[in-house]
Each structure stands twice: as structure tokens, then as C-alpha cells.
């Protein structure tokens, strides 16, 4: 991949010495509030959310190559990252308009690539919901939006990480078998679209191409794919782009995510790392709400550390350097 000298430096900061991106994602806002609301009756406060992000950053960034945070609640956490950890900042508003199936993208109102860079970030991350089968009108609007962000990142000479979440406008349950059957095409075709150089994207943050809960050998009940078919989808995904790409954990349990990475490697996927969020830190939320800072730190230093340490060991065996793409 052809990077400017400045982008190259940022990419080095975001990855480990082997060129693998082992990044910790904690840019959750709406999802985090919902998670906290399970354990407390009152609305989570801004200071609560900020403090939890600080705790996770302090305890886990010594073991991550970089951390993804949001500028709304994550700025205090950006000040306590480990010296060796890079920083990504999210540029999108959380969630989407549920009154429409379009899920149009929307930047944070008072942020820009310039401002994100001024906060010390090594990359701009933007999340896009994309249904490859949506109308040309809707997808053209989304594509133009991404072009603007890409141009901003070129102007600021900062890497652009695009996170693509595939969906189907007509299927409301993305976790069911109906969507599982069409997910591979949705994920792979979206990657092809945004691999076009016109978008100026440096790294794709993507879903694995199948729902592992419906893969033979992983499924508890009915299956949507046998192992050979699932493996073929991972290979097809790998061939869909020349860009570096990393997997998101999509909130699945740590063990399943780790097993998925091994499966991807065995299938022949040359992915370049992960941006792993809830699979690493989710359990700290309950401890934080019920036992405060001390409880959260204890969890992060034991189970949280174990999650990230096991993930790192698996990444060294399964991921390849982004420099090879």
C-alpha cells in the first residue's frame, strides 16, 4: 500500500512491532449506556462513562497496540494511554435513525479530521452502515459522504479507518439464520465497493463474513454453512480487497472471537489484526457499577488481562502484517 511518510508513522504507532494491529475498541456510547443500565436503575452519568473509559485505558493499553475512543466521553481516557499505544478517534455519531431503514451516516457536529488530529489521534475511524442491495440513491449518498471524509483525511495526512457494518433493509433480525445466509455477500460486496482508491481509505474494519453461531461445529442448533463453505467465504473476503483489513469483535464472547480468528487463519485469510471491544472489557461494566473503581480494576487486572493476553497470543499466530498488503 502506498502511504505518505506521515501516514506510515501513524500506522506504525497503531500496530505492534510485527505490523499487527491489536487494538482495543472502547468508542461505544449508546451500547455502553444500555449495558450499564442493566445494572443500575438511574441513567448513567457522563462522569461515570468517562471514568470507566479511563480505567479500561489505564489497565489494558499496556497490552494493546492502540485504542479506539470517542471524542464525546473518551477524551479523558486519551490522556492515560500507555506510551507505546496509538490512538484512534471515532468521527461518527452513535447509533442511527430507527425511523428509517436507510441508516444514513452522520459525523459528530463539532468534530473534523483536523480536530481529531489535534487531539493527538493517529487515525480517524468512521462507522458506516451499508446494505449493498439498497437503492442506488441511498448508496450514492453514503459513498459521497465517505469520499468527503477520505478527502479530509488526505488533507490532514492522517490514516482513515472505515468500519463497515452490513445489514439488510428488509430483515430486522441481523442475528437470525435468514440474515446469516446472505451475510457473506453483504460483507464481501461492501468491502469491494470501499476498496476503490477514490475513497482514500487506509484500513477496513470489517465483520467476519459469516455468523459463526450458524457454522457447523460452532452452532448450538441449526446451521447455515458447513465448515468448508464458511472457510471459502473467509478466503473470498481476503481476496475482495488490496487494503489492510482488521476484524471487529461484534460483541461476541472472547472465547468465540479467538476461535473465529483461528478459523480465519486456517481458511487462508491474511487479516491484519483486530479492533476488539466488548469481547475484552464487557465484564468490567457490571463490576464498575456494583463495586466501583476498585471492583472494575480488579476485574480488568484478572479476567480483562486474561482476555487481552490470550487474544494477543492468538493474533501473533493468526494475523499478518499490514505491510504485506
Swiss-Prot record:
Identify the domain of life: Bacteria
This protein's pathway:
Carbohydrate metabolism; D-tagatose 6-phosphate degradation; D-glyceraldehyde 3-phosphate and glycerone phosphate from D-tagatose 6-phosphate: step 2/2
The Gene Ontology biological process terms listed for this entry are:
6-sulfoquinovose(1-) catabolic process; D-tagatose 6-phosphate catabolic process; lactose catabolic process via tagatose-6-phosphate
Q: Which GO terms describe its molecular function?
A: 6-deoxy-6-sulfofructose-1-phosphate aldolase activity; tagatose-6-phosphate kinase activity; tagatose-bisphosphate aldolase activity
Q: What is its EC number?
A: 4.1.2.40
- Which enzyme class? lyase
| Keywords from the UniProt entry | Lactose metabolism, Lyase
| Pfam families linked to this entry | DeoC (PF01791)
Q: Which InterPro entries match?
A: Aldolase_TIM (IPR013785), DeoC/FbaB/LacD_aldolase (IPR002915), LacD_aldolase (IPR050552), Tag_1.6-dipho_adolase (IPR005927)
Name the chemical reaction catalysed here.
D-tagatofuranose 1,6-bisphosphate = D-glyceraldehyde 3-phosphate + dihydroxyacetone phosphate
Q: Which family does it belong to?
A: Belongs to the aldolase LacD family.
What is the protein name stated in its UniProt record?
Tagatose 1,6-diphosphate aldolase
